[in-house]
Amino acid sequence: VGRIVVDSLTAAGEEVRVLSRGRRPQQATEVRHVVGDVQTGDGLDAALDGVDTIVHCVYPTEQLVAAAKRAGSPHLVYVSIVGIDRIPFVFYRMMLANERAIAESGLPWTVLRATQFHDLIAFLLRMLAKPPVIALPSGLRFQPVDVRDVGERLARLALGEPIGRAPDFGGPQARTLDELARSYLAVVGKRRPIAPIRLPGKVFGGIRAGGLLAPERAAGTITFEQYLNEQHTAGQRPYRDAIRAYLPLPHHRRKTSR
């Protein structure tokens, strides 16, 4: 999603910095790469100097918030996940704590919660489809969304005024995992029998109850099938960049005269 944010902001004529822990090749003349570590705080003061908006797409938050305060309180835009306050999953508790830290920081802020990315669902299905029979958790429902839709929305929020909690951003359709699995198998050309299994526990119960859905906020435009077919037509595995997509880097927009 971070790459989409960068592309959208540069297309809008903004000067963009990309923060990473190591030097990266320059991908465009409009983008400046800076070195810093949001986990330790190293390099953040220099990276944030002169920045008026931060789009934060990774999970460590404490050091970034502290550095942002020292930098003059830029607008902090954070991408989070729909349902983190409804599903008792450890990682979601961490995300919720990050949201609270941002909201209580005194910084101008905007938080956008999005439903699960197509990449993550495709990666999950790839793992499940490796054995000759797919043991598929039954009753789970997702509303997968494309990173392009979310990235473009984040860029628009970054260009606007801070609004606190933005309306949730969901994919175009809420689907069962069984439906998504059959679409995945059809596109990648695999034949696998599906054996439904019911997983116990509050996490899976919450997902079955729709805890990860935002049906009233179906703002995404790219369906899971469109995503899969695009990847297949391009000769790419639909899940290839899934993990990389979930480990993006924070992006910073410098002050510009408008």
Task: Kindly label every feature range from the protein language model.
Residues 63, 67, 101:
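Short, conserved SAM-binding segment of the class I
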Residues 185-258:
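A hydrophobic C-terminal alpha-helical subdomain
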Residues 45, 65, 147-155, 221-228, ...:
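Short, amphipathic alpha-helical "lid/cap" segments that border enzyme active or binding sites
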Residues 10, 48-49, 53, 66, ...:
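N-terminal Rossmann-like NAD(P)+-binding domain of SDR-like oxidoreductases, especially those catalyzing
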Residues 58, 77-80, 113-115:
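Active-site beta-alpha turn of Rossmann-fold NAD(P)-dependent dehydrogenases/reductases
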Residues 3-22, 26-31, 39-41, 71-74, ...:
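Oxidoreductase cofactor-interface core, primarily capturing Rossmann-like NAD(P)-dependent enzymes
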Residues 20, 38, 59, 81, ...:
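Short glycine-/small-residue-rich Rossmann-like dinucleotide-binding loops
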Residues 31-63:
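Conserved Rossmann-fold cofactor-binding substructure of NAD(P)-dependent oxidoreductases
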